[in-house]
Amino acid sequence: MHIMFIPSWYSNVRNKVHGSFFKEQASELQKAGVKVTVAYNEVWPLTMIGKIHEEKGLNYNIEDGLKTYRYKNYNYIPKNALMFKVFNKRMEKLYKEIVKKEGPIDIIHAQSSLWGGISATYISEKYNIPLVITEHSSVERGPYVKKSYVPFIR
């Protein structure tokens, strides 16, 4: 079984413990014999322009034993529901690269609806792959949910 693991937030060079639970869960699945590939849309806020000196776009590394594909770029349309369309296209690039390099995906496991779960749903529906979302907050009552986001969450 091959799981594409989509975290909504994840460790990075500026915050090594961000999403540590997600990484631990993926590692435990891998230790249990499951093939796990992490697909992370690493979104940078516009306030970080000039402060981040990493290459934008798709990259691959083995991080703590996990095959990790990242798509790194800024959120050019923050706090606007259109950003989800951009996120979905980035996730699709990650998905296609993972399938090309690692083989077909049997199941997608997203951690939290915002933001990874939205893109996971897009990929799941477009490519007919079963999806599991582990939620970590009350999405409908959460402080980050705008009315314009609701159609993407449901």
Identify the function of each model-found stretch.
Residues M1-K67:
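N-terminal subdomain of nucleotide-sugar transferases
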Residues W9-N12, Y74-P78, S138-R141:
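A short, flexible beta-alpha/helix-coil linker loop
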Residues V17, F21, M83-M91, F152:
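Soluble or luminal CAZymes and related metallo-dependent hydrolases
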Residues V17, Y127-V132, S138-R154:
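Nucleotide-sugar donor phosphate/pyrophosphate-binding loop at the beta->alpha transition
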Residues K23-S27, T121, V150-R154:
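Short amphipathic alpha-helical segments and helix-helix/interface helices
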Residues V38-E102:
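A conserved catalytic-core segment of Leloir-type glycosyltransferases
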Residues Y40, A110-S112, I133-E135:
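A cross-domain feature marking catalytic cores of carbohydrate-active enzymes
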Residues F84-N88, I105-Y127:
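An aromatic- and histidine-rich active-site surface loop
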